[in-house]
Amino acid sequence: EPEHDFCYYFQKADLARQFKDWDSVVKYGESALSLSDHPFEPAEQFVFIEGYAHVGEWERAVDLSVSSYEVSQDVMGRMLCRLWRRIGEETAPSLERGAALEKVQNMFACDL
């Protein structure tokens, strides 16, 4: 079997996301994001941002959001706000979650 590339892990993570298997999303994200050949299409980070948020790795989710935002602020800002609005609706309240949502709201001028 050939060595797996970013696309392989992205597809696996996206499928796991559809089943809300957040641990698998994070596992595939770790593999995908550690590769030196991964393309940086900001929207392709969203599945991993969502996965990290759902397992409580809020700082990692925020960091990936920032790196996506830096590529194209005009487009990514609105998209990230929609993603984080959904994350806020789907995740349980916690101090870390609140801090992450506040940080995202301030950085991207979101209405969360």
Language model region names:
Residues E1-L112:
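C-terminal luminal/periplasmic domains and tails of membrane-associated envelope-modifying transferases
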